C-alpha cells in the first residue's frame, strides 16, 4: 500500500525497496519486524536478569533513577566531559576496536548562550567533508550555569548522567568518527 498523501511515510513498497537496495537485505518487512521484536525481547530479558542479579529485583528505571540522583560529578561539567571523552577514545584506541583517522581533531566546548535552547544536553557539529582540517565540535549544554540555587544547579547537572555513553555516541566511536573518516 502507498503512504497517505502529505505523509512522511514511504509506504510498504518503497520501504521494502530501501531495505533491499540500501541495506542489501533480502528480508521482507515482516521478517525485519519479527527480527527487531525478537531482539527487543532478548535484550529486555537480559535487562530483567541483570536487574534481578545486581539490582535486588528493582526495575531498570528505578536503578537508573537512583544512580542518577546520587551522581554528582567532581568539578566543572565541561572538564568532566573532556576527560570522559578522552577516556572513552583511549579505550577504543587501546582495544583497536575502530580506526582513528590521522589528524582528526575534536574540541569539547560549551554551547554558546544564544544556542542553549537548541540542544538538550549535548550535540556534535562535523567539519565539511573536504575541509583540510577535520575538526569536529562536541557541544556540551551546561544549563546549570544559568541557575542560581544549588538544588537547581545540581538538577541540571544530573541531566548529564551517563556521560560516557554520550561521549561514545557523539565522539568516539560515534558521530565524530563517522564524519571524519
Regions found by a protein language model. Give the residues of each.
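N-terminal maturation segment of proteins
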Residues: 1-181
